A protein has these predicted regions:
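Catalytic cores of the polymerase beta-like nucleotidyltransferase superfamily
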Residues: 1-440
Length: 440
């Protein structure tokens, strides 16, 4: 098997690259120096090196070393070992976690550890090896760059520096189909990095995407949930959505939604999901919070809405119909992309409030204002109005109602604000003198 990786790496000295320790997390540097002082090799690796070379601020700093996880734990009291598929060491510094991975091996006789492969997919990879073998085990060339704390050089085995310069995303190795089969999540990572970095996928890596989406069904639903968050909560969610659909991957993550989107409604394309993801991207760019509950409410709304309409047509009451539709869609989705309860329950509450937002008379609007999911449900209603799904008048009414004073709210909910005359309590008549006398 011929792999596109060099036995003799390109080593770029400190004077010829742009990475400065001033831009590296202080805690990551502590880990690197402690490993070096312990007699181990220590490298900053992966997306952190890539982003530093691109002039971006890394989100995470990962470390690679020849120390085993157990040896790492002996060096750091604040270390915790995690993972079954990939054994990793997490070194905790308050809220920051530095992930430390032992060099992965290629499977030669002198490597240490174990690897299990089922149907071509690596289900456990705790086989340890050399730095060169570790580079071979990585996914993309731009993620196989090593920053050496010993001499501050950058080590490149796979042509990642040239690909960074060219804006090209390329899988390591000469068999992209096999690399995707080893770990199907690499297909989602290919889409995510292409969107995040603005890079073009190398054609040999792009072609298999169109035929390999079914492999995602072999990935644990909980892991796919985490990958979906990375795809859609990184600021390029709309672009990721469009690429996932282009490569036929979205249908394997959200088949019910894809089925709805593939059919136009009254000769108009359904735009709600696109508008929702565009709104999410904008909020992230403005440093505003976004929640997984709202994101998944957007991604699964079309099948919920369709089933809701069917149930209402069967004479179900709107609130009941929405609860039934929500439950059906969520239960079908759960085996594919598992949504934790802490997000699944508020997601369903956002949906459940939609028919209740149609009720604008009496005390109901006041009660809705105090509901813990009202704001999210209101924002969801605004998106529906933008997509032409509901009348803009309804969304505007709720906007005005929130801003109105007491009398204005009364006028909006009581048709003119006329106060009812309070009913008088009937006074019990006292016994007459005659009756009193007769009682004796």
């Amino acid at each position: 098997m011929q792999e596109s990786i060099s036995n003799t790496p390109l080593v770029v000295p400190r004077s010829e690259h742009s990475i400065s320790r001033a831009n590296i997390s202080e805690n990551a540097l502590k880990v690197l120096y402690r490993l070096k002082q312990g007699g181990y090799q220590a490298y900053l690796v992966g997306g952190g090196v890539r982003d530093l070379l691109l002039g971006r601020e890394p989100k995470d700093f990962d470390v690679a070393t020849d120390a085993t996880p157990e040896e790492v734990r002996k060096l750091f009291r604040n270390c915790r070992l995690i993972g079954r598929r990939f054994r990793l060491a997490h070194v905790h510094f308050g809220r920051e976690i530095i992930e430390v991975a032992t060099f992965r091996g290629g499977g030669s006789e002198d490597t240490e550890g174990e690897r299990h492969i089922e149907n071509g997919m690596i289900v456990r990879d705790n086989l340890y090896g050399t730095r060169e073998e570790d580079a071979l085990r990585r996914d993309f060339t731009v993620n196989a760059l090593y920053y050496n704390i010993a001499d501050f050089s950058v080590v490149d085995y796979a042509g990642g520096l040239a690909d960074l310069e060219a804006g090209r995303l390329r899988l390591i190795g000469d068999a992209p189909e096999r690399r995707y089969r080893e770990d199907p999540v690499r297909m989602l990572r290919a889409v995510r990095f292409a969107c995040k970095l603005g890079f073009n996928l190398e054609p040999s890596c792009e072609r298999p995407l169109l035929e390999s989406g079914h492999l995602l069904r072999d990935i644990a639903p909980a892991r796919l949930f985490e990958e979906v968050l990375k795809l859609f909560q990184g600021g390029t969610g709309l672009s990721a959505f469009e690429k996932l659909r282009h490569y036929g991957l979205f249908s394997h993550l959200f088949p019910a939604t894809e089925d709805c989107l593939s059919h136009e409604e009254q000769a108009f394309p359904i735009t709600f999901v696109s508008r929702g993801l565009e709104n999410t991207d904008r909020r992230i760019q403005e440093d505003k919070p976004v929640t997984p509950a709202f994101l998944f409410a957007v991604l699964l709304w079309e099948p919920v809405r369709q089933r809701y309409r069917e149930l209402v047509a069967q004479d179900r009451m709107p609130v009941e119909a929405m609860l039934l539709a929500s439950g059906e869609v969520a239960s079908v989705q759960q085996p594919l992309v598992a949504i934790p309860k802490r997000f699944g329950l508020p997601m369903r509450e956002i949906w459940a409030l939609q028919p209740r937002l149609e009720q604008r008379q009496g005390k109901r609007p006041y009660r809705l204002l105090t509901h813990p999911r009202f704001r999210a449900a209101y924002d969801f209603l605004l998106l529906r109005a933008e997509a032409g799904e509901v009348e803009t008048e309804r969304a505007e009414w709720w906007t005005r109602f929130q801003d109105a004073n007491g009398q204005e709210r009364a006028n909006m909910t009581d048709g003119g604000g006329k106060r009812r005359r309070p009913r008088r309590r009937r006074r019990r008549s006292s016994p007459s003198a005659t009756e009193s006398a007769g009682a004796d």
